[in-house]
Amino acid sequence: MISTLLIIDAMNLVRRIYAVQQKQHGDTPTALIATQSTTTNALKKLLRIHQPTHAICVFDSHAPSWRHQIYPEYKQGRKPIPELLKQGLPAIQEQFFDLGIDSLVTEEDEADDLIACLADKIAKQQQKCIIVSTDKGFYQLLNESIQLYDYFQNSFVIRQQVHQKMGISIQQLNDYWAITGISSSAIKGVEGIGSKGALSLLQQYGSLNNIFQQAEDSNNKLLTKIKSQQSNAILAKQLVTLKTDIKLGFNLKDLRYTDSTD
């Protein structure tokens, strides 16, 4: 029997729900209470839809990560989590636990890396994993075993659709972001080359390494920019690539889900 692990990108879900309540109620206890209730109902719905054998909610610790250590500008300019919501997270985690779902958070690792590590381990065991998030960074993980589900659109992100939309393969995504950067995370990439230029280079040469090789002896304007900012591209790729080698300290059996409402 194939197991199905449901991984909730908890802050991705909670912050979007809180943003809706915040518009209606401001940063008030009413907004927090509504968020707690709505988030719990969302989790119930996800469990009902996907019928997982295993499940976990992964939270960010909000502490500086290894990405901040090698690139201090990482995520500069992002709005911090509202203090009221931050104070309410333990109660949300407790509600998740009451539904039979544990929460995972560590001081050393970002939630995205923890999620990637969990998903990778499941895929290597030929089991099924469903990540619930709107974060495009998880596109790089998509394969036969790992799926991405957008709760707010009530739909899966399909690999073929990503390919058609982006114009490149899943395997080329990190090379693409290494060139274009990711503005929402303040990752610069190669200045002067946007989406169109990055696509052109990857469609022609296939990979970032091949682009570097071609740039060595070329007068092409795009390749010249790549050559002069090669270190930026290498750093950007390191930043956008999710880690899958974190020692978690637990096994899949520890995440088994049993419906506590029965």
UniProtKB/Swiss-Prot annotation:
Protein's name in the database: Flap endonuclease Xni
Family from the record: Belongs to the Xni family.
Keyword Cell membrane among UniProt keywords: no
NCBIfam families: PRK09482.1
UniProt keyword list: DNA-binding, Endonuclease, Hydrolase, Magnesium, Metal-binding, Nuclease, Potassium
High-level lineage: Bacteria, Pseudomonadati, Pseudomonadota, Gammaproteobacteria, Alteromonadales
Binding site for K(+): I179, V190, I193
Biological source species: Psychromonas ingrahamii (strain DSM 17664 / CCUG 51855 / 37)
An individual GO BP term: DNA replication, Okazaki fragment processing
